[in-house]
Amino acid sequence: MAARLRDYWDLTKPKVVALIVFTALVGMFLAIPGIPSVVQIQSGALGFLGIWLAAAAAAAINQLLDAKIDAQMARTSWRPLVVGKVRPVQVLVFAGVLITLSMTILTLGVNLITAVLTFTSLIGYAVIYTVYLKRMTSQNIVIGGLAGAMPPMLGWAAVTGLSTAADWINASLLVAIIFVWTPPHFWALAIFRRADYAKASIPMLPVTHGVQHTSRQILLYTVILSVVTLLPVATGMSGVFYLGAALVLDAVFLWYAWRLLDPPDELFAMKTFGYSIVYLMALFAFLMFDHWLRLADFYWN
């Protein structure tokens, strides 16, 4: 029984989903300008659960649709569906249950806009990216990155309903950060795993355009990212605490991207990939801490 539960747990890509729901949680905290009301706490808790269920469902559908590809790649050849621990119909039913629960919770317990945006993001990743973009273009990560960048807006929507223009603008800034972060994050991994992607006929950028070109694109997007991460300060959403942290995190990421250029180094690409995860977690954590510090200063004074 425990082994079977573990198989279903692995279908949800728990580490990936943890980062997704963390950014959604930060979106919730930043959306509340003061002490949250009982209604906001309830909406936030249900929103968190609904977003987690949807992300888990998307991960399961991704594994269902990518089973043949996963079987050809060393990184994914262990997955439960690939090795026969679960059957395709079981994955389909599992994902269907998660989606049903997610949409029910978000529609009835949170608000309609959160449910609609969450479902749209799920389809964007699990179907449009997985079935079409991933297999068709080397810009798959860039075009499909919007679906994966949406969680902060989903969290923001859960507690505010995105009822004002300011809500949309501020939530969009958080989405923009993840959207621009996604290419250097995934391309660093793709450099390290390019033989796997080539074997599976997936047109990732290092496969179609080479490692040197991909490294230059990683640096370009990292430069853009270092600018985008300053926008929350420029709009007044965040303050000097976040600014200082962002500048340090950006400087380190830029160093990784620059170091990756000459000579192209597969092992260093994996280190860059690892740092990109730490980077995003830390950046959003500092966004949240900065928000709390500014609230505390407001109430103390």
Curated annotation (Swiss-Prot):
PROSITE patterns according to UniProt: UBIA (PS00943)
Bilayer topology term: Multi-pass membrane protein
Pathway this chain belongs to: Porphyrin-containing compound metabolism; heme O biosynthesis; heme O from protoheme: step 1/1
Catalyzed chemical reaction(s): heme b + (2E,6E)-farnesyl diphosphate + H2O = Fe(II)-heme o + diphosphate
Compartments reported by the entry: Cell inner membrane
Record EC number: 2.5.1.141
Primary location group: membrane
Chain ranges passing through the membrane: 16-36, 41-61, 93-113, 114-134, 141-161, 172-192, 217-237, 238-258, 273-293
Single annotated GO MF: protoheme IX farnesyltransferase activity
The UniProt record lists the keyword Transmembrane: yes
GO CC term (a single one): plasma membrane
Gene Ontology process terms (BP): heme O biosynthetic process
Keywords, comma-separated and alphabetical: Cell inner membrane, Cell membrane, Heme biosynthesis, Membrane, Transferase, Transmembrane, Transmembrane helix
EC top class, as a word: transferase
Function: Converts heme B (protoheme IX) to heme O by substitution of the vinyl group on carbon 2 of heme B porphyrin ring with a hydroxyethyl farnesyl side group.
PANTHER family: 4-HYDROXYBENZOATE SOLANESYLTRANSFERASE (PTHR43448:SF7), PROTOHEME IX FARNESYLTRANSFERASE, MITOCHONDRIAL (PTHR43448)
Sequence similarity: Belongs to the UbiA prenyltransferase family. Protoheme IX farnesyltransferase subfamily.
Additional remark text: Carbon 2 of the heme B porphyrin ring is defined according to the Fischer nomenclature.
Protein name, as recorded: Protoheme IX farnesyltransferase
Origin species: Xylella fastidiosa (strain 9a5c)
Biological classification of the source: Bacteria, Pseudomonadati, Pseudomonadota, Gammaproteobacteria, Lysobacterales
Gene for this chain: cyoE
